[in-house]
Amino acid sequence: MTKYYIVTLLLLFGVTNKAQAQFGFSHEIGGIMGPVAFQSDYGERNDISTNAGNTGFGIGLIHYLNFSYKAECNCYTPETYFNDHFKLRSELSYNKTELQHFGKWVDKSRTSLIANQLRGMRGSTSVTNIGMQLEYFPLSIRDFTSTIGSWAPFVSLGGQFSFYDPEAYSTLGELDTPLTTPVKYLGATTNQGGTVWSIVSSIGTRYKLTELSDLMVDLRVQYYFSNWVDGLNPDPKVYLENRANDWNVW
C-alpha cells in the first residue's frame, strides 16, 4: 500500500525562561502534543479512511536557544540579522500509532483470501525522537517578544535520531505464513526495533499570550531513512507503490 499526505496540526505551548543561560543566550522550554498521521505500508493511497484510521498521538519536551536576548543582563544581544530571525530548537518526543489496512481492497464486499488476509493484518509502531531544528522567523523576534498579542510565523529544518519499536501481527494466526499473509508481505514483516535518522521540516506560527508564554501551531513532516519503522517493507523493486520510506505528519 502506498503513502498519502494528510494535513494535521501540532499544538505547542511554550513558556520562556529568562534564567542564566550558557553563552549568554536565553532559554525557552515547552511541551508539545498532537495527532500524528503515520504514512506507512498499511492502507491505500488517496483514501480518507487510511489517513484518519492510521493516526496516533505524540507528546514531547522542547527547548529553545533565543539568540536575541541575553539572560545574564536582561538585555538584547547585539542586533544582527541572525540573532533577530533565528532560534535553535532541541526536542525529545514520543509518538505511537496503531496501524491497519483501509480502503477498497479491504471492503466488506470483498470475500477473497487476499482481502481477508489484509483485513486481518494489524500493526503498531512506537517512536522516540531526539534532535534539533533551526527555525527561521521572517519577522523580528525582538518585536514579537515585546508585543503581547503579536504573531510570529516561522519555518524550520533539522534532523532527528529515532528509536522505533514496531509490532506486526494477524488476527487470523501467526503472521508470515501463506494462510495469513498476502504474497506481497511474505518475508517483509518484522517485530524487531531499531534506530534511524530522519529529516524534519515544519511551518507554523507563534502567538504571544503573555510576557513569558507563547502558543504555537506547528505543521511538521518527518521523513525516515528507513522503510522498516512500521514493521512492513514489501520489495520496492516489485511493488513500486511501496518504494517510499516511512514518514509522518505532526
Over which residues does each language-model region extend?
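Residues that define the transmembrane beta-barrel architecture of outer-membrane proteins
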Residues: F25, N51-F57, D84, S126-I130, ...
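Extracellular loop and loop/strand-boundary signature of outer-membrane beta-barrel proteins
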Residues: D41-S49, A115-G123, D143, V183-N191, ...
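Predominantly the C-terminal beta-signal and adjacent terminal strand-loop region
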Residues: G24, S40-E44, S49, R206-W250
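Flexible, surface-exposed loop regions and adjacent strand-edge segments
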Residues: N46-T50, K104-S112, T171-P178, L232-L240
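Short loop/turn motifs that connect adjacent beta-strands in outer-membrane beta-barrel proteins
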Residues: A21-F25, N66-H85, S124, S140-A152, ...
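Structural signature of outer-membrane beta-barrel domains
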Residues: G34-S40, N66-S68, S93-L99, Q160-P166, ...
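Short glycine/proline- and aromatic-enriched beta-strand/turn motifs that initiate or cap beta-hairpins
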Residues: A21-E72
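Residues on the lipid-exposed face of transmembrane beta-strands in outer-membrane beta-barrel proteins
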Residues: G31-P35, I59-L65, A71, M132-P138, ...
